[in-house]
A protein has these predicted regions:
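Short, solvent-exposed loop/turn and secondary-structure capping segments
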Residues: 37-41, 95, 141, 178-179
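Short, solvent-exposed turn/loop segments enriched in Gly/Ser/Thr/Pro and often Arg
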Residues: 30-36, 85-89, 134, 235-238
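Substrate-binding groove of N-acetylhexosamine-processing glycoside hydrolases
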Residues: 14-17, 23, 63-75, 79-80, ...
Length: 255
């Protein structure tokens, strides 16, 4: 944001070193498809733009950009893990891609993109993971992630690569049965599963702990009940990142 700093390569290497000294594995989380509106709104990025926030999949310039991201991450982090994002890429293939290539099913575009980006990540020594929602949205008539009666077609399950960990993110439900059902849906895929909850740090200067605990407790019970031991907590900084990291300590302990 405005007048906010950013970490350079030396800063990231220093953070990685301090984390390692404390027994913490620092893992980069980047975006390689959607959520790139702040980058894509510049005119210089126009050749890489499908829609205002989604990269132009299938274009070689896009993959040169992504490989540059991966090279930078490889130079700054000692971990083998990387999170490639790829969530909420709605309207994929309906902007610049449509003009350039004609109409293609968004799911087919995504599958080719996932395969290409995953190969690039592995080329640079990473074990990749991605958010899972786009696989669910393709099975939804409303392009939604969360639906009570959704069933994932076997063709979708079979098409997802087995060597790309799927991260089921859910910050919103307070019903253990819902988490239980969605974990079981994710477990139909061959890929390893990780769960990501949310600490509700994105509403202002304070963590909404009332909401957080109502969501976290049933989510973690469902994870334990279904053998999901790889879990993470997100602390997004939407709308200015006003929440102090010190205010998050209770949530980190609870998780």
């Amino acid at each position: 944001g405005y007048q906010r700093g950013r970490y350079g390569a030396e800063d990231l290497r220093a953070l990685d070193g301090w984390a390692a000294a404390l027994g913490i594995e620092l893992i980069p989380c980047i975006q390689t498809l959607g959520h790139l509106e702040r980058f894509l709104h510049w005119e210089s990025s126009a050749p890489l733009r499908d829609t205002p926030d989604v990269l132009l999949a299938g274009d070689e310039e896009t993959y040169r950009l992504i490989e540059a991201m991966l090279r930078r991450c490889r130079a700054c982090y000692r971990t083998k893990k990387i999170h490639l994002g790829m969530d909420e890429a709605m309207n994929l293939g309906l902007g610049g891609y449509l003009k350039k290539n004609g109409y293609h099913e968004s799911f087919d575009i995504m599958l080719r993109h996932v395969e290409r980006v995953g190969a690039l990540a592995r080329k640079h020594g990473f074990e990749p993971m991605m958010w899972s929602d786009m696989y669910f949205r393709c099975a939804s008539p409303n392009d939604d992630y969360y639906e009570d009666d959704i069933e994932i077609p076997q063709t979708v399950i079979d098409a997802a690569p087995a060597d790309m960990t799927l991260v089921y993110w859910d910050y919103y439900h307070d019903d253990e049965a819902f988490y239980d059902r969605y974990i079981r849906l994710h477990q139909k895929f061959a890929a390893p599963l990780r769960f990501a909850g949310g600490m509700w740090t994105w509403l202002g200067p304070a963590v909404d702990y009332d909401v957080f605990f109502k969501k976290a407790e049933p989510a973690l019970r469902a994870c334990l009940g279904n053998g999901v031991t790889d879990v993470m907590i997100t602390t997004w900084g939407d709308d200015g990142g006003e929440t102090s990291p010190q205010a998050m300590l209770l949530g980190l302990q609870a998780w």
